Amino acid sequence: MEIRRRPPNPKVRVAHLEYAVPHDDEEPRHILEKIVWEKDREIDAARDKVPLDNLKQQIAKLPPTKDFLGALQAAATKPAVIAEVKKASPSKGVIREDFDPVAIAKAYASGGASCLSVLTDKTFFQGGFDVLVEVRQAVDLPLLCKEFVLSPYQLFQARAAGADAVLLIAAILSDQDLRYLNKAAAALGLTVLVEVHDATEMDRVLSIGGFPLIGINNRDLTSFETDLATTERLLVDFNDRLKQQGVLLVSESGLFSRADLDRVQAAGAGAVLVGEALMRQQDVEAGLVQLIQAG
């Protein structure tokens, strides 16, 4: 899938005036492209508001990051669970009306999650870096910043907010971007979870190398439908290369029951990322315990 990083004819702002020459192809072609275009604008605005040097000063005062990958590898129950703090999504709208990220994070920690994932996109997922800060202050588990990362600046934002790991989405990044952002994340002590959706992206990531944690998103990026067979197919096709590189595989999206977890674990997934299934539970902790202990 091709993702154009910016509209072909972006608007230009001079003083209080904004203008652009009309263009037939200036609308995003699908939701992911729409998110990426908006994210580019958000990054520019964030840089103006909080300069990079300010983030570096905040980071200098923080303790070392927690071992996200190590926590997954050491999980007492398999597959290890990354539980997601998620209020909404573009495909489902608001998932949890009574969204209390601190209470949810504490429930996940008590329920046996190995790590947590926190959505930081405001526009489409109603998350935020402020949510990540709140969760960091509430729990000791390793935290993944779930964001549409396009710029190294966002890695500094994630680290300053308390993240231990960051998501890199292969579909929206070039090979050069993936290499550079992986190195930049490592320099900040951040673990990278690189996400793929199909065989082309998996081949790219494995060819680049240096990614011990790879996520397979079972959601089709154009239809937003989920299919756990995506994890099964990619693990069959790339099993040897994944083993050679010592990759821990995370299955993401479409996981709602212990049977789903057992299915992707049988295929070779060492961890799962579960969000919506838990967010819709009246008792989040009990829902997670049931999901983990049923195995």
Swiss-Prot record:
InterPro entries: Aldolase_TIM, Indole-3-glycerol_P_synth, Indole-3-glycerol_P_synth_dom, Indole-3-GlycerolPSynthase_CS, RibuloseP-bd_barrel. Keywords: Amino-acid biosynthesis, Aromatic amino acid biosynthesis, Decarboxylase, Lyase, Tryptophan biosynthesis. Pathway: Amino-acid biosynthesis; L-tryptophan biosynthesis; L-tryptophan from chorismate: step 4/5. Coiled coil: none annotated. Transmembrane segments: none annotated. NCBIfam families: PRK00278.1-4, PRK00278.2-4. This is Indole-3-glycerol phosphate synthase. The gene is trpC.
